[in-house]
């Protein structure tokens, strides 16, 4: 672990060094560019200095010339003033002298006029040069002020960056010193490990020699004594039934019972928390009995009302898991199939938490925006919103690890056996994180409730609801702490119990092999139980062989008799059909005979021959006795019942009902009743067919609706997958854009440093030049 931490710190130092190196390259480039710009600005400043000096020299020469001209004008004016009285005195002299003085005066006037014009021109040039110099000086001063402000800003930025980089450099140097110390200690440990490895190698050689001797002895014993060896394939070894460890199973059932009790307490606390939160929304910040609450809180209350359908399955899933752990099973991750159900219920609850989290945050924001919310209450609400986010994140983390633990019972390659211990350790860490988050929620909510109780508008209902929520949060905190401590206390046992299985430590290969092993274990237990039963009295072997021959012969004769009985039944059914046929024929023939006798009797009555009548009666009696069978002769006074394939006919003898029409009426009534019965059966069958047809149509409609819903769900799933891919693309693009912006910001910072250094140098040069100019002006 120390080497891994050291390697991670080395990697972090290398990354920081690479970042600083890249920034150093950028800064070097910026410094070079800044130096080039400063050199160019220096050249420009020199050129401007030279032009300024030329202008100053011209101005000095002009002022000197102006002074000379002024002195010359004064001298000329003095000479003129002296010459005027002399001219008056000498006016009387000759005209030659006056003409001479007039010419000299004109020359002097012309010279004076030229000097005056030149002086005026020089004054104008001097004024323009002075104005231009003042304008340039004002412009340079304003630019100097702006540059000084910008330089101060850039200097502040540079100071902050230098401070930051110095801190990072000091931190890296300290880390480097620590890592050097650690590397020295690790080198010492490595030397000690080398010495230990040498000692272990010596011990290994001795053990290898000892074990090789034992192996040869064992191989010789196995080759001589063991007829077959089935330990070649690990897939088959996983099917071997392990030794039954009743203590282990009782311990696992006890642990599962404790976990079930903790989960039940946690489920009760979660139900109370969500229910009381729903009640609080109805009364604060707006009481629903007085005024309507916001649509957001209405939707949030509706979602919170459904919390039982998401929280209760957690208890049911844990109960099923507890019931699946019995004394007769082998409890490892590959056989705990019910853990997958608990993981699915936990996933559905986390989806519920994700669904209500935005509404919860918006509800807290709405409380902050209300007029009753103070600054302290607003701070507590912000802390609670952060705690709710952490709570959802902790539940998601816990569900991820539990889903990983449920993989070995469903997917063979979902989780490697070597990662079981790390996943269990992470589950314990997640439970401790859940406990910490619940402690923060309890602390912040108690502060929030205390602040709300001090409000002048706090009602008794709000105070009671806050107390209930606080008690449920405290119960959640206690339950989370109990579960975390329980899991931490049993973590070593969980990790150690993973080796419980076939061949002690080889483990199961797949859930199917674990299931087969459990079936083999049940069969082995049933076999061992059957061995405990006392043996029943058995038949001797010779007698059993004799009885077997008799049994075979009796079974053969039985099969033959069964065939004969079947043939006899078929013959009887055929004879019954023929009997019915001939009975109907006899009845029809009898009816025809009676009609014929009646016709003959009518004829005899008409002819009035008594002899013929007697003869006809004798013939009728003879024909009646010949046409009747033994059954009709015995049943003279009883009604005769005729059974056919189409129904049953009941008739009386000739002595009771001699009338032919009554007999025909009986047959007619019988067939009419049979027709009525068949029509009723037909109507019943029609009604059933209509009912079945309606049910089939309803089922077909439901099937069509189900197909449509299936298609809609597939479309939604496709859209969801597309949205997921789109969001992933957006995430990558935003990540890249942020990285580009960071690089651009670093480049911009370097360019700002360059401009800052340039402006600083320019300011220094301008200050120097302004100081030189001021000194020159003072000297002048």
Curated annotation (Swiss-Prot):
Record GO cellular component, one term: early endosome
Principal cellular location given in the protein's record: other
The organism's place on the tree of life at top rank: Eukaryota
Keyword RNA-binding annotated: yes
Residues recorded as bearing Phosphothreonine in the entry: 652
Residue span of region Disordered: 84-104, 760-780
Localization of this protein: Early endosome
Record note on what altering residue 75 to R does: In NEDHFBA; uncertain significance
GO-annotated molecular function: RNA binding
Alphabetic keyword roster: Coiled coil, Disease variant, Endosome, Intellectual disability, Phosphoprotein, RNA-binding
Key word Plastid present: no
Pfam families cross-referenced by the UniProt entry: KLRAQ, PPP1R21_C, PPP1R21_helical
PANTHER family linked to this entry: PROTEIN PHOSPHATASE 1 REGULATORY SUBUNIT 21, SMOOTH MUSCLE MYOSIN HEAVY CHAIN-RELATED
Function, in words: Component of the FERRY complex (Five-subunit Endosomal Rab5 and RNA/ribosome intermediary). The FERRY complex directly interacts with mRNAs and RAB5A, and functions as a RAB5A effector involved in the localization and the distribution of specific mRNAs most likely by mediating their endosomal transport. The complex recruits mRNAs and ribosomes to early endosomes through direct mRNA-interaction. In the complex, PPP1R21 serves as a binding hub connecting all five complex subunits and mediating the binding to mRNA and early endosomes via RAB5A.
Known disease link: Neurodevelopmental disorder with hypotonia, facial dysmorphism, and brain abnormalities: An autosomal recessive disorder characterized by global developmental delay, severely impaired intellectual development, hypotonia, coarse facial features, and muscle weakness, often resulting in the inability to walk or sit. Additional features include feeding difficulties, respiratory distress, scoliosis, poor visual function, and rotary nystagmus.
Subunit comment: Component of the FERRY complex, composed of five subunits: TBCK, PPP1R21, FERRY3, CRYZL1 and GATAD1, with a ratio of 1:2:1:2:4 respectively. PPP1R21 serves as a binding hub connecting all five complex subunits to mediate the binding to specific mitochondrial mRNAs. Interacts with the GTP-bound form of RAB5A (via its C-terminal region); linking the mRNP complex onto trafficking endosomes for active mRNA transport. Interacts with PPP1CA.
The protein, known as: Protein phosphatase 1 regulatory subunit 21
């Amino acid at each position: 672990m120390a080497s891994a931490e050291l390697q991670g710190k080395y990697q972090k130092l290398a990354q920081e060094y690479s970042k600083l190196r890249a920034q150093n390259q950028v800064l070097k480039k910026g410094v070079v560019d800044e130096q080039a710009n400063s050199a160019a600005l220096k050249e420009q400043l020199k050129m401007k200095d030279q032009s300024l000096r030329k202008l100053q020299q011209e101005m000095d020469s002009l002022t000197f010339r102006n002074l000379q001209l002024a002195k010359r004008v004064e001298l000329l004016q003095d000479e003129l003033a002296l010459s005027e009285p002399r001219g008056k005195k000498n006016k009387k002299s000759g005209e030659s002298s006056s003409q001479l003085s007039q010419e000299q005066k004109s020359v002097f006037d012309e010279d004076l006029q030229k000097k005056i014009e030149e002086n005026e021109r020089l004054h104008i040039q001097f004024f323009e040069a002075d104005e231009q110099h003042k304008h340039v000086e004002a412009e340079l001063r304003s630019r100097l002020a702006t540059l000084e402000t910008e330089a101060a800003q850039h200097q502040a930025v540079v100071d902050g960056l230098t401070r930051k980089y110095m801190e990072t450099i000091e931190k890296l140097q300290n880390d480097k010193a620590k890592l050097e110390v650690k590397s020295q200690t690790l080198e010492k440990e490595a030397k000690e490990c080398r010495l230990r490895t040498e000692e272990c190698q010596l011990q290994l050689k001795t053990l290898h020699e000892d074990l090789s001797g034992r192996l040869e002895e064992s191989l010789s014993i196995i080759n001589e004594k063991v007829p077959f060896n089935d330990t070649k394939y690990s897939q088959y070894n996983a099917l071997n039934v392990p030794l039954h460890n009743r203590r282990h199973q009782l311990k696992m059932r006890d642990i599962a019972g404790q976990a079930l009790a903790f989960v039940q307490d946690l489920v009760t606390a979660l139900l109370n928390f969500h229910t009381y939160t729903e009640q609080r929304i109805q009364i604060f910040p707006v009481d629903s009995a007085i005024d309507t609450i916001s649509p957001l809180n209405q939707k949030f209350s509706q979602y919170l009302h459904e919390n039982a359908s998401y929280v209760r399955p957690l208890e049911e899933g844990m109960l099923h898991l507890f019931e699946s752990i019995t004394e007769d099973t082998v409890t490892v991750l590959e056989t705990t199939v019910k853990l997958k159900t608990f993981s699915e219920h936990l996933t559905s609850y986390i989806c519920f938490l994700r669904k209500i989290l935005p509404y919860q945050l918006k509800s807290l924001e709405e409380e902050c925006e209300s007029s009753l919310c103070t600054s302290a209450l607003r701070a507590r609400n912000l802390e609670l919103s952060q705690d709710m986010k952490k709570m959802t994140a902790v539940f998601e983390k816990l569900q991820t690890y539990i889903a990983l633990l449920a993989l070995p019972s469903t997917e063979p390659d979902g989780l490697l056996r070597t990662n079981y211990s790390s996943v269990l350790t992470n589950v314990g860490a997640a439970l401790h994180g859940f406990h910490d988050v619940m402690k923060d929620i309890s602390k912040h909510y108690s502060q929030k409730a205390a602040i709300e109780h001090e409000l002048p508008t706090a009602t008794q209902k709000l105070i009671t609801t806050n107390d209930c929520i606080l008690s449920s949060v405290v119960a959640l905190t206690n339950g989370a702490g109990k579960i975390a401590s329980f899991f931490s206390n049993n973590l070593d046992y969980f990790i150690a119990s993973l080796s419980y299985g076939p061949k002690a430590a080889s483990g199961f290969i797949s859930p199917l092999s674990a299931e087969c092993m459990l079936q083999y274990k049940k069969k082995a237990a049933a076999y061992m139980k059957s061995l405990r039963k006392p043996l029943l009295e058995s038949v001797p072997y010779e007698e059993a062989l004799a009885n077997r021959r008799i049994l075979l012969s009796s079974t053969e004769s039985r099969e033959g008799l069964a065939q004969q009985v079947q043939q006899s039944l078929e013959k009887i059914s055929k004879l019954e059909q023929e009997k019915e046929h001939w009975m109907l024929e006899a009845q029809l023939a009898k009816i025809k005979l009676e009609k014929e006798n009646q016709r003959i009797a009518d004829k005899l009555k008409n002819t009035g021959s008594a002899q013929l009548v007697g003869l006809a009666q004798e013939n009728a009696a003879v024909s009646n006795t010949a046409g009747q069978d033994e059954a009709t002769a015995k049943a003279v006074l009883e009604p005769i019942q005729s059974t056919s394939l189409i129904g049953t006919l009941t008739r009386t003898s000739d002595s009771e009902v001699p009338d032919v029409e009554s007999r025909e009426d009986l047959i007619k009534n019988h067939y009419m009743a049979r027709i009525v019965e068949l029509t009723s059966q037909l109507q019943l069958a029609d009604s059933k067919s209509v009912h079945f047809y309606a049910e089939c149509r309803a089922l077909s409609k439901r099937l069509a609706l189900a197909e449509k819903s299936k298609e809609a769900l597939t479309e939604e799933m496709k859209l969801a997958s597309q949205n997921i891919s789109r969001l992933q693309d957006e995430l990558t693009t935003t990540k890249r854009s942020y990285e580009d912006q960071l690089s651009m910001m670093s480049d911009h910072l370097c360019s700002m440093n360059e401009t800052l250094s340039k402006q600083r140098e320019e300011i220094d040069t301008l200050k120097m030049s302004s100081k030189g100019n001021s000194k020159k002006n003072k000297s002048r």
